[in-house]
Amino acid sequence: MKPIKEIADQLELKDDILYPYGHYIAKIDHRFLKSLENHEDGKLILVTAVTPTPAGEGKTTTSIGLSMSLNRIGKKSIVTLREPSLGPTLGLKGGATGGGRSRVLPSDEINLHFTGDMHAVASAHNLLAAVLDSHIKHGNELKIDITRVFWKRTMDMNDRALRSIVIGLGGSANGFPREDSFIITAASEVMAILALSENMKDLKERLGKIIVALDADRKIVRISDLGIQGAMAVLLKDAINPNLVQTTEGTPALIHCGPFANIAHGTNSIIATKMAMKLSEYTVTEAGFGADLGAEKFIDFVSRVGGFYPNAAVLVATVRALKYHGGANLKNIHEENLEALKEGFKNLRVHVENLRKFNLPVVVALNRFSTDTEKEIAYVVKECEKLGVRVAVSEVFKKGSEGGVELAKAVAEAAKDVEPAYLYEMNDPVEKKIEILAKEIYRAGRVEFSDTAKNALKFIKKHGFDELPVIVAKTPKSISHDPSLRGAPEGYTFVVSDLFVSAGAGFVVALSGDINLMPGLPKKPNALNMDVDDSGNIVGVS
């Protein structure tokens, strides 16, 4: 690894805006972005993927490798990524810093505590929870209805036992007993707000708008009513600054914030993306989950807030993922199966069609694995060419930037200025926005709203939230809301079970299916593979 000062020098960053965290990590003062206003924006490349499978598609690995490969062919590039969540790192998923010869470094530190941003978000979130219950205990001047408190508690850990709890037990000295729950930190609205805020003023204004409860008269109670947004911003003072690290080939990477891609927008901070666009020719950024969730939200929501628009989309696919979506069993996923591949290619086709609805040039990155056969690779390449999309076989995991040169050249050729094309207008009613997304992206035949959802729509209209963008929270395992429907389901009924407003983040969340905001650990969590020796060397994290 190179000292972080050398990485900063590549970007001509001065010492007075850098806050080093050891030898290989530094924060960049978020106010530095203001000084870059007159710099021309580079091109923005959005990396997304086909519908995720249990085996993983290598989207983060591809994002990192693409940025390294662009640098290799003489195109100055920065990759911007979300911060990993500690819970999934210790649980089923493991680390989230890429793999093989295409990683961000120092991987162990990034995957674990990093610069403390997750801790800061959790602290700000839980400060509000504590102040809220303290207010209720000490007279409840705001007349908060304790049966209608929306704000949960949070921790950055997978712990299913905390999904439903009762607090305030043990007598009046401990407050009023009520039901509560914990969510994982990545699902906190504070995390979404941090990722969307462009400066401290914006951050405090957004925090103040958060809806925490209803009062006895069914009126909204916000953080600004409690007056705690300033203290929350104090706890986030350093977390608002993007984190500078490096790739395995010593090229720059910005890693900042980590909002969920279902309950929120699922991408790194707007500050980091805009800063990277000012400092490079090509910014490579990643959207969470598949293109139906992450890419749609990036374009319809994040791009509008940030004032930018992608110049091209990279759709990551693997032969094994397409075979899985074609009905192949995971146990036999590494065996050649052209029939399953043919059927599963329909999933890729849907995502290509969807991305084209946003006016985006699409490049398919076929992430190659050692078990892929030449016939399978040739089939995918041929079918992509029939669709009229560029396709490049990527081997960045095995070969680093050398394995991504073909992909980098294809992306550089494809990237262009495009006319933004959003799926819905902001003044469309919320239910119309949902119907557009369900039919255009998820390929549903019709949309059905539960009675709970219908009541939520009335609340949204009554309080003036109807013109907010919509974030759909559904399973990432299918284009539909049903995780059992692989491939390219269509014509089904898309069911909206509930809606709620993230007023500080600035969107309405539409829930479809079972969405769990506090994951649990598997029988054998990844934590069992981890250890540290007497010299401080860590094993089993990434």
UniProtKB/Swiss-Prot annotation:
The keyword Nucleotide-binding applies. Keywords: ATP-binding, Ligase, Nucleotide-binding, One-carbon metabolism. ATP binds at T53, P54, A55, G56, E57, G58, K59, T60. One of its GO terms (biological process) is tetrahydrofolate interconversion. It comes from the Bacteria. CDD domains: FTHFS. Its EC number is 6.3.4.3. This is Formate--tetrahydrofolate ligase. Coiled coil: none annotated. The gene is fhs. The keyword Ligase applies. Belongs to the formate--tetrahydrofolate ligase family. It comes from Thermotoga maritima (strain ATCC 43589 / DSM 3109 / JCM 10099 / NBRC 100826 / MSB8). PROSITE patterns: FTHFS_1, FTHFS_2. It catalyses: (6S)-5,6,7,8-tetrahydrofolate + formate + ATP = (6R)-10-formyltetrahydrofolate + ADP + phosphate. The lineage of its organism: Bacteria, Thermotogati, Thermotogota, Thermotogae, Thermotogales. Pathway: One-carbon metabolism; tetrahydrofolate interconversion. GO terms for molecular function: ATP binding; formate-tetrahydrofolate ligase activity.
